[in-house]
Amino acid sequence: MTALAPSSTPLPAGRRGAVDIVKGLIALTKPRIIELLLVTTVPTMMLAARGWPSSRLVVVTVLAGALAAGSANTLNCFIDRDIDQVMRRTARRPLVRSVIRPAEALAFGVALGVVATLLMGFLVNWLSAILADAAIVFYVGVYTIGLKRRTPSNIVIGGAAGCFPVLIGWSAVTGRVGWPAVVLFAVIFAWTPPHFWALAMRFREDYAAAHVPMLPVVAEPLVVARQILWYSYGMVAASLALAPVAHVGWVYVAIAALLGGWFLAEAHRIVQRVRLGRDPRPMRLFHMSISYLTLLFVAVALAPYLP
């Protein structure tokens, strides 16, 4: 195991202030990831309602969904605290620096999950609560414990956990899981590998040092680039398939096609640069993938209002 970076030195036991603890607990929930998950929830609710649903329903669903995601992320940090010490990208996480103790993180993660379940069940509906719990179990049990350290397919299968917000959003409005939600699930499912493999290409040495078999660690760069490209095509196809399933109009189709072409051009660029032996600059695709998903779901939100 490599040594911790100087900036990651654990805090002395007596130097944990209340502010440090609060900030540490918030950091464990990975707020930026929660933001991205919620970007998909509200537009899905708007599509299901064919407009703006009840504001109360939106607020409660978003709050409970954020707590559920925070629970999953906190438990992920608790389980992965050993490898987080090895990776430079994660070396400043609260558990690594002893800002938060493992027992505190575990209790906090479980508490968030319980509160999320009760809020979702009593104030939204129990199908949405079950889906939120399924997302937590899938992310923590299937991905973090079962797949992450064992197979290069970890993010392909485990990434399904990040697709649950669209199912939750749809069921919150309709009380069931409709086919449009399934199609949006497929969009995010296909989006996840290019997004995370681009990140893993950039931090390949980190994952290798932690013995996490991400695809860029165990496969040749050209294999990774081609896989990114194929999943990107699947993502774009799924985004266009929403049109006949959800009865959205030509404006959504045009936006989805333009965004898809933009994304595919970048995926092709990575393949080409790898073939030429150049730096693929994968973080361009990583950041682009966030913009792509955000803009696509803005189009989903506006679809009920557009021709």
Curated annotation (Swiss-Prot):
Pfam families the record matches: UbiA
Instruction: Tell me what reaction this enzyme catalyses.
Output: heme b + (2E,6E)-farnesyl diphosphate + H2O = Fe(II)-heme o + diphosphate
Q: Name one GO cellular component term.
A: plasma membrane
Transmembrane ranges, per UniProt, are: 33-53, 59-79, 106-126, 127-147, 155-175, 181-201, 208-230, 245-265, 285-305
Q: Where can this protein be found?
A: Cell membrane
User: For this protein, what is the EC number?
Assistant: 2.5.1.141
Give the GO biological process terms.
Answer: heme O biosynthetic process
Topology in the lipid bilayer: Multi-pass membrane protein
Which pathway does this chain act in?
Answer: Porphyrin-containing compound metabolism; heme O biosynthesis; heme O from protoheme: step 1/1
| Source superkingdom | Bacteria
Give the family per the record: Belongs to the UbiA prenyltransferase family. Protoheme IX farnesyltransferase subfamily.
- Fill in the misc note: Carbon 2 of the heme B porphyrin ring is defined according to the Fischer nomenclature.
Q: What is this protein called?
A: Protoheme IX farnesyltransferase
What high-level taxonomic lineage is stated for the organism? Bacteria, Bacillati, Actinomycetota, Actinomycetes, Acidothermales
Gene name? ctaB
